[in-house]
Each structure stands twice: as C-alpha cells, then as structure tokens.
Regions:
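Conserved ABC transporter NBD signature motif
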Residues: 58-70, 399-407, 416
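A short, surface-exposed alpha-helical micro-motif characterized by mixed small hydrophobic
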Residues: 205-207, 536-538
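ABC ATPase nucleotide-binding domains
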Residues: 228-282, 307-309, 313, 317-329, ...
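Conserved ABC ATPase "signature" region
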Residues: 116-134, 449-467, 477
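Helix-to-loop junction immediately C-terminal to a conserved catalytic motif
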Residues: 50, 391
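Conserved ABC ATPase "signature" C-loop
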Residues: 218-219, 549
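H-loop/switch region of ABC-family ATPase nucleotide-binding domains
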Residues: 199-200, 530-531
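ABC ATPase C-loop
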Residues: 155-156, 488
Length: 594
C-alpha cells in the first residue's frame, strides 16, 4: 500500500541528503516499525508518506512515494487526509478544538461524514483508548499522556487505510502504552489498517511489529526485514534483545515471555552473584550541600559517567567529566558532614486542587542532597503537578513545600532560580532566543552568573554546537542538553526533569544517565517524572509511585519496581525472582566470573 521508489530528501542549506536511496514497499495490513539512531531521518521518512515532506517542510524530494496509488509529490496533505492519518511527536500541534469529544469528531466533520456515523465512531474510540471519562474535559487540562491518546484517537475516527505515527507511546505510562499498542494491533489484524511507526522505546513495540525498517545512519539506504534479524544488527535495540545477544540466545527474543523461556541457564550462571546492593550504588547518605562539594575521587563506574547528551562527540573519561562539571559549577573543597545532610526539599501533606480536580492529596516527600528520585505512575497521576509545586508554578491548596527553607510559590522567582531548576517535558519551552549564544547570554543574566558560564556548560554538555545555531534546529537530545545547561547556569541544588528521555534513542539516553549521575555525585538532588522504567532502573536511588494524586509506594528502586508488573524493567521481568534491574548489571556480573 506504500511504495518508496529511489526516494531522497535534501533540505535547504544542508550539504548532504537527509534520506537517500529509499527503495522499499510496505504491504497492506502490516505494522512496520521504523528504527535507527536519532537524526537519521525517521521523521522525514514518515513525512514523505503523509505529504508533509516536502509540501509543508520544504526541501527537495527526489524519487516517488505512492500511498494506495496516490503520488505524495502531486497530492498535498489535505488531499491525502482520507487515506493517511498522522500523529507527530508533539500532539499539541495537532489540536484544533477545545474538548476531547470535539477533537475526536473534527477529522470526520472535515471529511463530511454523516452525524450518526460520527457519533458511533466517537463512542468506539472513547472506549478503545480509555477516554470515556475525559470526553468533556478541555484538552488544555489533560496530562501529556492523555493528550497523546486524544491525538491518536483523532486520527483513528476517520478510519484511514494508513496510520503514520511518530513516537506514539513516548508520553504514555506503561499500561496506557500497552493499551494503545493493543488497539493498533487490533486495527492491523481485524481491519487491515497499515501502520508505519517510528519509536525509540523499542522495548514497548518491537514485539508487535511484522517487519522492521532500519535507518542505520543519515543518508544511508534503509534495511527491511524480520524484527529478530534486524535487531541482531541494529545499533539500537531494546534490553530484551541486548540481554539475548549477551547470553547468546538463538533465536533472539523480542518479548519478555520468549526470553523467560530461555533464561534458565542465565539464571543459573547468575545464582552465585548478586545485584549491586543500594549501598554499592551512588549514595546520598552523607553529602555536603552542593555549594560545598568537591569532586569525588572514586566514581561508581567508568561507564556511569560517560559522554554528553548530544549524539555527536567522543566519550569523556569519568574522572575528567566529574572534574570539569565540578569546576564549571563552581565547586570548592567539601567539608565532611558529621551526619546525614538536611533535605534539599521537604514536602509535607501537600494537596493541590485545580478546579474540580484534586491533582495531589496529602503528598509527603523529602529528597536529600545527591539523591535521585524517580516519580512514576499512570498519566494524570500528579507527577508534573508535584514538579510544578516544587518549582513554585503551583501554589499548595493545603500542606507545605519547602526548597532550601523557602516556600517556592511565595518566593521571588529570581531567588528560587538559585535553589531549584526545572527542565520541562518540552525543553523547547525554555528556548526563546534565535541562537545558542543568545540563550546562554540570557541564562547568565537571569542567574546573575559571570559572562560565559552557560556557554562553558553548553560546550561541556553539547560539544560541537556553534554559537549561531538556532535552538529549534537541534535534535531532541541536543535541545535537552541545551535546556539542562540553561538550568544549571544558576547552580541549583535541586534539579527537576519532566519526561527527560522523550524523543531520545538508547545512546543519547545512556549519555544523559552519565551526566545526571555526575551531577548527583556532586551533590545535586534530582527529581524526575518519567514513564521510562529502564531509565528509573539505571539512574534512581528511590522510586515514588503516584496514583490519583497520592503516594502509593516509596522506597529503593529495586524493592519498588521488581514487585510491580507495570513498572518493572525488562531485565527484572526476565530474570525474576532474582533482582537484576539492568543489562549492564548482568554484564558486569558475567565479566566478573558469574
């Protein structure tokens, strides 16, 4: 149903094509997964199917893309709307109405469908995606994950023959992601819908794919084949496949169920070893305040403090990175604390009401210097609201929030910027200037820092990016690194991140983990709201699970996630009842002779 014939795309001002030599056919009624590192042109390839490339994005498209016989070069996106449904990485960019029900109906109204057909399809979609309780809600009041489901629903209601989805589960909690993928699988199997999907969180989707298309590098010709065959050679692969390669399993498993069937031998090899205890992980037990911290002499492991968040650039040895970050952030020699440090933030019986909705109820939380806490829970559980309360964007209805002894909502933002910094779910929300240099100059002024402070951090976190680069021209990972540098300019003891791995591939996520571990080792307290269970397993000392605005679990990461079917990482599910969380832990044990 989709055919690419020697397709290449070159954007204005670039010296090489983003896509080149794409020559493949997507069969009708299959779910085809598009994979590859960040920046290889996955979104561009999807855009050629919907007609957004080149009609909306510009650039030159050579070759031919046809969808059910229609040439996308000669048919604009509106002329393909009855055939192709598209959801991009930013669902907010798609919304044209105010409420959930109106948004689901809008596409059908545009196509002139009968009112009784529209009503039936809206009801079906509300039930399919678990949106019935939200039908009258203003879209602006929904969480990011709820908005993602609405965006997917709005393209399902017209019943297109082809669905083009760019990161469709990136903002969804694990349970909601499974529900959406089950719906997509039902559309493929029962209705013959063709789904072309790009997704970085392969652990969620690869088991559902009929075929996988690998874009190995920018401008390189794609490779198409069976999921197991492609995962064996792909530079990006989910933990289940990584563990399978490490253990030498053949065929390569793509699901937890398949991996568990063959994991007996690996479990036996690991019986004599044990996962790192919490005391062996980076620990926040007795750090000094961030302003007094020195560079630790013995980081946890070389791999933990690996290179920057940007895709480009060689790894930096752990000691160098820790030392450079310490110098850039103005650290001085530590004074050994006699006991546990005072918490950076203390939340007591916090409740927040937004209109008729009680977003948080009696939440109590403390975070110590050097501690990393992952907030988890389903969409709408209150994670982003809690981060907003910590930074002062939301005032408590009852209870109290203290950051560095101050109430954030009642303190001048210019004073709070030195105590707490937030990297929002969309890093671009922090980026207003036309160049990286202008962003850095503004960050220095806002933080009262010496000129060049922010630029030095950008150079460390994002090497190779020129001063004149427009922030909107950066990749997702690069924008995240820039936003992180802007926030760190003020050297806040408390760092907050909302869904920091959205849009990042595994390599970029690994580099982000290295940077955040370095910051925690220097004494920064880190609180991150995430649906990424693999990130929590790699990074967090503690996991706090929220449900309907309440804390339902709070404890060491291993203890909380291993017992949870929804929030356990793939490695934990495969090797249970042993308490291994990550492939890197297993690799370390095997290399040590397990």
């Amino acid at each position: 149903v989709i055919r690419f014939e020697q397709v290449s795309v070159r954007y204005d001002g670039t010296d090489r094509p983003t896509l080149s030599g794409v020559d493949l056919a997507v069969p009708e009624g299959e779910l085809v997964l598009l994979v590859g590192p960040s920046g290889v042109g996955k979104s561009t390839l999807l855009g050629t199917v919907s007609g957004l490339v080149p009609h909306f994005t510009g650039g030159v498209l050579s070759g031919r893309v046809t969808v059910d016989g229609r040439d996308t070069r000669t048919h604009k996106p509106r002329e393909l709307a009855d055939l192709v449904g598209t959801v991009g990485q930013d669902p907010q960019a798609h919304f044209v109405t105010d409420t959930v029900e109106d948004e689901l109906a809008y596409g059908m109204e545009s196509l002139g469908l009968a009112p009784d057909v529209m009503r039936r399809r809206v009801e079906e979609t509300l039930d399919l995606l678990g949106l019935a309780e939200l039908r009258d809600r203003p879209i602006a009041t929904l969480s990011g994950g709820q908005q993602q489901r609405v965006a997917i629903g709005s393209v399902l209601t017209p019943h297109p023959k082809v669905l083009v989805l760019d990161e469709p589960t990136s903002a969804l909690d694990p349970a909601a992601a499974e529900e959406v993928l089950a719906v997509l699988q039902r559309l493929v199997h029962d209705l013959g819908t063709t789904v072309l999907m790009a997704e970085h969180r392969l652990e969620r989707v690869v088991q559902y794919a009929d075929q996988v298309v690998l874009l190995p590098a920018p401008g390189a010709a794609p490779v198409m084949g069976a999921p197991a065959d492609i995962m064996a050679v792909s530079p990006v692969r989910p933990p289940v496949a990584e563990l399978g390669l490490l253990a030498g399993w053949d065929p390569l498993p793509l699901s937890v169920r398949d991996a568990r069937r063959g994991a007996g031998g690996l479990r036996a090899r690991l019986e004599s070893a044990s996962p790192p205890a919490p005391s062996e992980l980076p620990t926040p037990s007795k750090p000094s305040a961030p302003s007094e911290l020195s560079t630790p002499s013995k980081p946890s492991a070389p791999s933990e403090l690996a290179a920057d968040v940007s895709v480009a650039g060689p790894p930096v040895p752990s000691g160098q990175r820790l030392g450079r970050l310490a110098r850039l952030l103005g650290r001085t020699k530590a004074v050994e604390a006699p006991g546990p440090a005072d918490p950076v933030t203390r939340v007591e019986s916090l409740s927040v009401r937004r209109g008729r909705i009680e977003a948080l109820r009696r939440v109590t939380l403390t975070v110590a210097p050097g501690e990393t806490v992952a907030l988890m829970g389903r969409n709408g559980a209150g994670k982003s609201t809690l981060l907003s309360a910590l930074v002062g964007m939301v005032e408590p209805t009852s209870g109290s929030v203290r950051v560095g002894g101050l109430a954030p909502a009642r303190t001048d933002p210019r004073a709070m910027i030195r105590r707490v910094g937030l990297v929002p779910q969309e890093p671009r929300d922090l980026l207003y200037a036309d160049t990286v240099a202008a962003e850095c100059a503004a960050a220095d002024r806002d933080a009262g820092a010496d000129e060049g402070t922010c630029r030095a951090l950008v150079t460390e976190l994002l090497p190779g990016v020129e001063d004149g680069t427009h922030p909107r021209d950066l990749s997702e990972g690069q924008r995240l690194a820039l936003a992180l540098a802007l926030v760190l300019t003020a050297r806040p003891p408390l760092l907050l991140l909302d869904e920091p791995t959205r849009g990042l591939d595994y390599a970029a996520k690994g580099r982000l983990v290295g940077v955040l571990r370095a910051l925690a080792a220097e004494g920064h307290a880190i609180v991150l709201a995430t649906h990424d269970v693999e990130l929590a397993a790699e990074l967090a000392h503690r996991v706090v699970i929220l449900a309907d605005g309440e804390v339902v679990a709070d404890g060491p990461t291993g203890r909380v996630v291993v017992s949870s079917p929804a929030f356990a990482p793939q490695t934990a599910k495969i090797l249970a009842p042993q308490e291994w969380l990550t492939v890197s832990q297993v690799r370390g044990a095997l290399e040590a002779g397990a």
